[in-house]
Swiss-Prot record:
Organism in which the protein naturally occurs: Streptomyces coelicolor (strain ATCC BAA-471 / A3(2) / M145)
Reactions catalysed according to its record: an aromatic L-alpha-amino acid + 2-oxoglutarate = an aromatic oxo-acid + L-glutamate
UniProt family annotation: Belongs to the class-II pyridoxal-phosphate-dependent aminotransferase family.
Keyword annotations of the record: Aminotransferase, Pyridoxal phosphate, Transferase
HAMAP family in UniProt: HisC_aminotrans_2, Phe_aminotrans_2
UniProt key word Lipoprotein: no
Known role: Aminotransferase that catalyzes the conversion of aromatic amino acids and 2-oxoglutarate into corresponding aromatic oxo acids and L-glutamate.
Name of protein: Aromatic amino acid aminotransferase
Lineage: Bacteria, Bacillati, Actinomycetota, Actinomycetes, Kitasatosporales
Complex and partners: Homodimer.
Length: 359
């Protein structure tokens, strides 16, 4: 047998492995998972019934065009069907965007630290990542990002709110930034946590999409809508971009169950608003308690908070796990903590209080 291995693309060497939030241990003391920014509530009313009914058609392929879901989204956002595209979560759509715009020799700009998938999906395409450090306040440095644009730039991600810091870019600064971006460079406003925003100065990205053909908005059903396990997200973009997304989509990638669950979730708006409101209240309670303990906590507009711990990051994460909650450490930088059930948040706050005393 030959010992020669099949030749693989050189661009794949050195790609970092995506690290999902660690699950709660099934056989240990850990009871709460605060590591993946999931919604702690069960599916919205009507979703389980819809999913159960859709399960009867497992033997059939899903509607590849997501016809009913696209119609629902078109009505919800007031956009043409031709300006919509769906995918396996917003990260799946983000990867399609890079495939459609960027290849070897091209550049993709994004803030860092930001969403962990950006460097992975960029390198898969063969493009080069241009990482622009956050400001000392953990916010996108849009001036520096604009300065980083070259004739090789093809796409720019603006994660708003930013994952994992929860910080936001406000309307005036985003407008100034967009004015500096060449019209042939695609700007992707990644708004996975849009529903949790309460700052009136943070714009809805759809406003900018309506005015600028080079703006694309990403949304997901994984966070506020609580469908993380079903993998469905979507993009709103002008027709050339949306059409390219449909071309690069994995055939039948969004299951029929995911499509039906997304539609049912959209129709449960009142319950969604109530649940998100409760999580926003918990977010404020957790952040206020942390600041009272002496922590520096960036103002979060997402469903998580960020603590910059540097070299103490892993020790803090281990302390949380031993107490019964799992958080998401970024070694050498900090931890992201999902706002979960009040009981879980209380456990986390006890750990943070004790840990703070040791610093």
């Amino acid at each position: 047998m030959s010992e020669t291995s099949p030749k693989l693309r050189a661009e794949l060497e050195g790609i970092p492995t995506y690290k999902p939030g660690k699950p709660a241990a099934a056989d240990g003391p850990v009871a709460y998972k605060l590591s993946s920014n999931e919604n702690p509530y069960p599916p919205l009313p009507g979703v389980m019934e819809t999913v159960t009914a859709a399960a009867a058609s497992f033997n059939r392929y899903p509607d590849m065009a997501c016809t009913s879901l696209m119609a629902e989204l078109s009505d919800r956002f007031g956009v043409p069907l031709a300006h919509l595209a769906t995918g396996t979560g917003s990260v799946g759509v983000a990867q399609q965007l890079i495939q459609a715009t960027s290849g070897p020799g091209d550049e993709v700009i994004y803030a860092w630290r930001s969403f962990e998938a950006y460097p992975i999906i960029t390198q898969i395409s063969g493009a080069r990542s241009v990482q622009v450090p956050l400001t000392p306040g953990e916010v996108h440095d849009l001036d520096a990002m604009a300065d980083a644009i070259t004739d090789r730039t093809r796409l720019i991600f603006v994660c708003n709110p930013n994952n994992p810091t929860g910080t936001v870019v406000r309307r005036a600064e985003l407008e100034r930034f967009l004015d500096r971006v060449p019209s042939d460079v695609l700007v992707v406003l990644d708004e996975a946590y849009r529903e949790f925003i309460r700052d009136a100065e943070v714009p809805d990205g759809v406003e900018f999409y309506r005015e600028r053909p080079n703006v694309c908005v990403l949304r997901t059903f994984s966070k506020a809508y609580g469908l993380a396990g079903l993998r469905v997200g979507f993009a709103i973009a002008h027709e050339p971009v949306a059409a390219a997304l449909r071309k690069t989509a994995v055939p039948f990638g969004v299951s029929q169950i995911a499509q039906e669950a997304a539609i049912a979730s959209l129709r449960a708006e009142d319950e969604l608003i109530g649940r998100v409101g409760s999580l926003v209240c918990e977010r404020a309670r957790v952040a206020d308690a942390l600041r009272a303990q002496g922590w520096t906590v960036p103002e979060s507009q997402a469903n998580f908070v960020w603590l910059r711990l540097g070299e103490r990051t892993l020790a803090f994460a281990n302390a949380c796990e031993q107490a019964g909650v799992v958080v998401r450490p970024f070694a050498g930088e900090g931890v992201r903590v999902t706002v979960g059930e009040s009981e879980a948040n209380d456990i986390f706050l006890k750990v943070s209080e004790e840990f703070r005393k040791e610093l």
